[in-house]
């Protein structure tokens, strides 16, 4: 198994696909997706285009759908939800499909949607993602960070490092043996330095600071936790993620 890290969707190769692709948007799309499914949501369907989201979701009964839209960190007008995982309570999402479009995370998922196995990872469900990789042993794994509008992000990189670090710790393989590119080595180093203060790292990240200015302090606290949700969001059909059954 070789892990490759791409800091933004635009950096992924266009002439091939991996056996397994993992989209990461710690702040906050993949954290929200994991939370919705852990709270009993039927599925999460992702869109890059808001108009397309509205068109598709209109075909669902009102009581069976929720619309989540975020642009620039703020909720899209007319949608029930923005991109805060803390809003996704079991009382709200149980049995419903979440139709979601965000600034960055949904683009990452759409970029890798043709891979045989597509997962959504965040710090909060890291262990479930790692267990899938250890069980399935895919030959090539792409971890694709969402970044922020095409730029590198600390929070997605440290999550990739958390995944790679856990695989390193649970196998007899060295970091050099599991790393397919230098980005993985640097991500492991970042996680190793900050693993005991991930909230502090998120506070230093540019998108973390952006969310703090929007008074999303509790979101950062929640998203900085590791392994609190035993849920694996996996693509069942193009653009539709459901919880992997145990």
Swiss-Prot record:
SUPFAM superfamilies: ComB-like. It comes from the Bacteria. PANTHER family: 2-PHOSPHOSULFOLACTATE PHOSPHATASE-RELATED (PTHR37311:SF1). It comes from Nostoc punctiforme (strain ATCC 29133 / PCC 73102). It is an enzyme of class 3 (hydrolase). This is Probable 2-phosphosulfolactate phosphatase. Signal peptide: none annotated. Belongs to the ComB family. It holds the Pfam family 2-ph_phosp.
């Amino acid at each position: 198994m070789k892990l490759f890290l791409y800091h933004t969707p635009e950096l992924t190769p266009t002439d091939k696909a991996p056996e397994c692709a993992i989209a990461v948007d710690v702040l906050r799309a993949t954290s929200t997706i994991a939370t919705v499914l852990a709270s009993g949501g039927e599925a999460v369907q992702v869109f890059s285009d808001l108009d397309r989201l509205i068109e598709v979701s209109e075909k669902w009964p009102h009581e069976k759908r929720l619309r989540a839209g975020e642009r620039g960190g703020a909720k899209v007008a007319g949608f029930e939800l923005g991109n805060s995982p803390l809003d996704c309570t079991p009382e709200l999402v149980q049995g419903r499909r979440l139709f979601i479009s965000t600034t960055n995370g949904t683009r990452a998922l759409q970029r890798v949607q043709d891979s045989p196995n597509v997962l959504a990872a965040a710090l909060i469900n890291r262990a479930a993602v790692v267990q899938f990789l250890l069980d399935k042993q895919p030959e090539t794994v792409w971890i694709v960070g969402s970044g922020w509008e095409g730029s590198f992000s600390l929070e997605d990189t440290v999550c990739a490092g958390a995944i790679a670090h856990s695989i390193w710790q649970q196998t007899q393989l060295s970091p050099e043996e599991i790393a397919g590119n230098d980005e993985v080595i640097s991500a492991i180093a970042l996680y190793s330095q900050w693993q005991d203060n991930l909230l502090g790292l998120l506070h230093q990240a540019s998108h973390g600071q952006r969310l703090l200015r929007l008074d999303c302090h509790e979101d950062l606290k929640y998203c900085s936790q590791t392994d609190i949700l035993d849920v694996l969001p996996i693509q069942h059909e193009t653009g539709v993620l459901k919880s992997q059954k145990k």
